[in-house]
């Protein structure tokens, strides 16, 4: 080993030394004492304390890392545009932008720069009652609203809140409704599994419910994941239109995606593909 690379998936400020100064925590992670710490320098110090040889450390956000790893596998003459995306515990996107369009740089120069968009922090998005309830009880109310609608850390809780609302609206038999209203937690993995197969037993509260109730619950969950897919496609479409790419059917724009939610969810990936086809390909002829 001659050097170490770290993917860091929290807000940070890059330094000239290729390190990253932590700016904050997201995705309900709550730590103290992180302010102004350098990820690479702290790791190097700890490794040296444990007797390891000192090695150069480079820290990069996980989304640009996904972009770079994906772009190395695609021939330049194949893709007409490229973007990186992470859909896991959190959500984010990145893309190449002309340097002169990046206002914070204030440079009238040629060339492009890979920009970490931190799209999960987008807040100008319509919220449902479920979104507002989740946001109010989160570690950072009012922040990262887009992430709270589209990422694995929150889709389970959104599904739980939607199921309780459906129970209160009389969509289930009384006994099933009571059990759902008593449901304290629901993970995105269990919600996804149940939404894909109502007979899988992933939600214990619905284990002995009637078939009709289980199917109704699955439809509610599918709606939550389906809305997330629409939001994700809107995010991708924004990059397509911003970069004015994806106009050639035979040289499509490529989006490199990583993250546990996109990789393992049964519901999300096909829903995203369906929405991409309907919105970008069929409606806007972008490929």
Segments the model singles out, each with a brief description of its role:
Residues 9-11, 87-91, 121, 261:
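Glycine-rich beta-alpha junction loops
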Residues 3-7, 56-58, 82-86, 92, ...:
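Short glycine-aspartate micro-motif
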Residues 12-75, 81-83, 99-126, 269-274:
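Glycine-rich phosphate-binding loop and adjoining helix at the ATP-binding site
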Residues 80-82, 140-141:
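Intrinsically disordered, low-complexity segments enriched in polar/charged residues with Gly/Pro
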Residues 94-98:
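Short beta-strand-to-turn element immediately C-terminal to the catalytic PLP-Schiff-base lysine
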Residues 1-5, 45-48, 72-73, 121, ...:
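ATP-binding/phosphotransfer module of carbohydrate and carboxylate kinases, centering on a glycine-rich
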